């Protein structure tokens, strides 16, 4: 049939004039200038121009494909309400949900229950219960117990927050996580109030009391950024008020702080820390043979570089002459054990993917 700007074809059909309803079955095709519908069981009301789907159905437009197995689409208002395995697929991602509302004129969609946002190019999936889709802004907001899974070659990063924002502007792609962010990967974990991940350069930025754990080191600063390369942390940028702590035991902690710090990793292991401005450090000194505690070394130097191997300090390069003092272990007072603003937060570290919800 031809109705207004639509052509509808099928192998079988019937018309109920009293309710203005066409019934189409088997190889149903609806063609319009803006879209095409493919299904095997569809009812069409010629009065209100609403199509009803009963079975697997596709709505294909220029830049996206909408799929469902039950629902309706108002061809006059371009509003759809879809149920059962409903999804929107674009060139960039796939959005799934038990039910899906879509308004073409507002370029807005909403998915409810068992929501999944899948980006196969970046190997990322975000799960949740609600997703809002803003087509013109290329933005999707996922909420209600959302969890993000970022698949690397040998491992997966799991992240939880109250909300995830998935943004794409041309070739630029970002994920923003807001409120009570926690993430877990076997070789590094973190916690902060908000976070952004830029896929262009694999830069992660953490804000508001950020903390990162890797290779036994606790890494903190007012603002913390780190680069991911091949699924591993390659370097961490810290400023202001950075501090890196390595726990020796329940009593002693190796500590480094300064104005700006950059930490470098190799094969998931801390290899080097560059300190720029107001450098301070406390390190426990042990007997190389017996591992007995000899004392605590306290050093001050404006700029310094520390080299590590297997969590042990191997070498320190000072840019200027340092002020250094070693206190015999038996003479150490409690006040001398810690640098100013020392705060061990080991109890907050996620030890499994389940811990990101705690």
Give the label of every model feature segment.
Residues 1-358:
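Mature-chain termini and adjacent capping regions
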């Amino acid at each position: 049939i031809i109705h207004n700007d639509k052509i509808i074809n099928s192998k079988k059909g019937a018309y109920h004039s009293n309710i203005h309803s066409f019934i189409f079955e088997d190889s149903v095709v609806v063609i319009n200038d803006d879209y095409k519908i493919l299904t095997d069981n569809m009812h069409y009301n010629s009065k209100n121009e609403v199509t009803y789907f009963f079975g697997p159905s596709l709505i294909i437009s220029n830049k996206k494909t909408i799929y469902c197995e039950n629902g309706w689409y108002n061809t006059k208002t371009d509003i759809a309400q879809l149920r059962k395995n409903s999804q929107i697929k674009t060139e960039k991602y796939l959005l799934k949900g038990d039910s899906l509302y879509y308004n073409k004129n507002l370029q807005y969609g909403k998915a409810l229950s068992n929501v999944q946002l899948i980006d196969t190019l970046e190997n990322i999936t975000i799960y949740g219960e609600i997703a809002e889709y803003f087509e013109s802004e290329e933005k999707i907001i996922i909420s209600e117990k959302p969890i993000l899974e970022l698949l690397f070659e040998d491992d997966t990063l799991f992240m939880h927050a109250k909300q995830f924002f998935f943004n794409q502007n041309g070739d630029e792609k970002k994920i923003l996580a807001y409120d009570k962010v926690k993430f877990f990967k076997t070789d590094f974990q973190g916690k902060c109030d908000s976070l952004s991940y830029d896929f262009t350069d694999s830069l992660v930025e953490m804000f508001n009391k950020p903390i990162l754990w890797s290779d036994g080191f606790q890494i903190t600063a007012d603002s913390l950024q780190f680069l991911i390369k091949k699924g591993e942390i390659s370097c961490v940028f810290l400023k202001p008020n950075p501090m890196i702590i390595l726990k020796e035991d329940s009593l002693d902690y190796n500590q480094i702080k300064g104005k700006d710090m950059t930490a470098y990793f190799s094969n998931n292991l801390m290899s080097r820390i560059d300190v720029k401005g107001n450098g301070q450090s406390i390190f426990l000194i042990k007997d190389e043979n017996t591992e007995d505690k000899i004392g605590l070394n306290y050093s001050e130097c404006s700029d310094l570089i520390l080299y590590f191997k297997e969590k042990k300090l191997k070498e320190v390069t000072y840019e200027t002459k340092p002020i250094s003092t070693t206190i015999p272990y038996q003479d150490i007072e409690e006040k001398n054990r810690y640098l100013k603003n020392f705060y061990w937060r080991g109890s907050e570290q996620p030890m499994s993917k389940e811990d990101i919800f705690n």
